[in-house]
């Protein structure tokens, strides 16, 4: 029986990107699945028991880089078993209108699936990802934040501190790292505002010239 690590995964992005992401991570199960992000080879998945010895283990290592399903899961997902996590929150953020924020919660065996978060971030670089975990049995916790497909920040701490400092994040966790699409949108809005101000100034200058010429 493993120690269970509790996890929260919060993903934010443009509605179109988020629709594609949710469709991929949930697959056919309507729940977040590690296997939907990083697929275990069917040959290993269908094995009735671990194949750790002999020719079969060697063949599996040559083909898949792992002796059996357990070895593959730990190396690729970072945890022993797949998860089956339902969406616990799906909203449009009031802080950044037009962005969809989806949250999942789930338990994983022994460790958080950090490798899966890396793959998700790289596959969907226009999204923001916040992932946190708390494993009280071995007394560790932490969180990761991703932007532009890359790890922006990671914090590791003991379970007690982590439980109260990051496991229940507020909407403002994403305030300081908007996605590239949001940055571009804000950039365009700023350019439009600047051009509008310039047009007003030009019109006022022309009006002043007309008055001076009367």
Predicted regions located by residue number:
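Intrinsic low-complexity, intrinsically disordered or marginally ordered coil/linker segments
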Residues: 1-214
């Amino acid at each position: 029986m493993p120690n269970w690590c509790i996890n929260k995964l919060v993903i934010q992005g443009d509605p179109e990107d988020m629709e594609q992401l949710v469709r991929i991570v949930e697959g056919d199960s309507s729940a977040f699945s590690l296997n939907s992000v990083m697929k275990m080879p069917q040959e290993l998945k269908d094995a009735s028991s671990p194949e750790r010895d002999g020719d079969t283990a060697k063949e599996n290592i040559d083909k898949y880089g792992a002796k059996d399903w357990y070895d593959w899961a730990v190396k690729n997902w970072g945890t022993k078993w797949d998860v089956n996590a339902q969406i616990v929150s799906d909203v449009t953020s009031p802080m950044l209108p037009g962005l969809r924020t989806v949250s999942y919660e789930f338990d994983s065996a022994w460790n958080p699936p950090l490798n899966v978060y890396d793959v998700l971030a790289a596959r969907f670089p226009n999204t923001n990802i916040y992932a946190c975990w708390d494993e009280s049995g071995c007394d560790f916790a932490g969180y990761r934040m991703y932007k532009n497909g890359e790890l922006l920040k990671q914090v590791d701490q003991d379970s007690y501190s982590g439980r109260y400092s990051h496991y229940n994040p507020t909407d403002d966790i994403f305030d300081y790292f908007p996605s590239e699409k949001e940055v571009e949108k804000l950039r365009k809005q700023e350019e439009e505002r600047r051009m509008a101000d310039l047009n007003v100034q030009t019109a006022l200058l022309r009006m002043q010239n007309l008055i001076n010429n009367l």
